[in-house]
């Protein structure tokens, strides 16, 4: 990893230091996704079978996972994996349930009551990728809040393996969250199918889940068309660690590597006011990297990552807020005392014994988070992501008589005569 001294960098160099790996969507990628979506819309399941054969190397008679396949998955996974997923579900449920909104009502004027009521989104589509490895944890992170929200129907798509099966852990994870409509479908074609619907795949109101550049582009295109809403902008995974001189170098290095192994376009940053800590972390990175099965992937990510020396921890937080990381680890002696300095981050991990991996799997928070700086304005997935907040108002005759004049003045100022008339008629006055 490159080591930089923030105090010695020019403004342009500082901007470059915080620049994420280039992930421009090439024109050919955008056009390929648009063509694929159009094909799925026009030919439905026929197109899906051809595309799946081309990209996944398997021809499927049926996309739907059968009850027999669910049963086989149940029998295939190790008992300790099942128990770990059950434990994770319980904690994810506990955390997300605590944050649920029940709506509210308030009288804003005599005879005028305004309410906010909460309704589940009708049908949602979950995408669980399986590029370099299947991700049953993503099925848990999406399935639990969808269940708590009360969505009428939850659809899940995940890529098939070359033998036509689906990773059994993903199927068990789906079952544990109450998801039974699972389809063997991956990539941009899965997004197109869930957005527009085919004979086999129902169209969904909102789509959730991470994916590669084709999946990300497909989500953007279907959202722009109005076919389906999406959870948030997506991008490569990332972590920023702020560490003081008392941090454990081995812990910090392990956290950086746990994010770097996601993919070659991941980015990891360390900000510290200690030269000794930075040097020790670099040594640990070299030692630990050699032991990883995905060392080649992690090494590519580290090549575009940074170890940055800062003058003060306060400066580190200013840099972090500018970067707005997906994951922020505070490897500090008094991490909670610094929490108020955090303005933009997807998820924060406090202290030496809270690795980012806990949030990925089983602490209870959600690991589907905004990336690429989107944490400045977006939040991670929650139960509210699967719900609509509907406004309700009711006015009595006395209520409209009391506040109607306000509406009349504003309607006239905007030149909207019909608006004014709708109020005036009820008040029995001239518009």
Swiss-Prot record:
Active-site residues (renumbered): 326 (proton acceptor), 327 (proton acceptor)
GO molecular function: histidinol dehydrogenase activity; NAD binding; zinc ion binding
Database matches in InterPro entries: Ald_DH/histidinol_DH, Histidinol_DH_CS, Histidinol_DH_monofunct, Hstdl_DH
Annotated pathway: Amino-acid biosynthesis; L-histidine biosynthesis; L-histidine from 5-phospho-alpha-D-ribose 1-diphosphate: step 9/9
UniProt binding sites for Zn(2+): 259, 262, 360, 419
Key words of the record: Amino-acid biosynthesis, Histidine biosynthesis, Metal-binding, NAD, Oxidoreductase, Zinc
A biological process from GO: L-histidine biosynthetic process
Residues noted as binding substrate in the record, renumbered to the chain: 237, 259, 262, 327, 360, 414, 419
One Pfam family linked to the record: Histidinol_dh
Reaction(s) catalysed (UniProt annotation): L-histidinol + 2 NAD(+) + H2O = L-histidine + 2 NADH + 3 H(+)
Ligand binding (NAD(+)): 127, 189, 212
SUPFAM superfamilies assigned: ALDH-like (SSF53720)
Signal peptide: none
E.C. no: 1.1.1.23
Alphabetized HAMAP family for the sequence: HisD
Protein function: Catalyzes the sequential NAD-dependent oxidations of L-histidinol to L-histidinaldehyde and then to L-histidine.
Protein name listed in UniProt: Histidinol dehydrogenase
Organism, as annotated: Xanthomonas campestris pv. campestris (strain 8004)
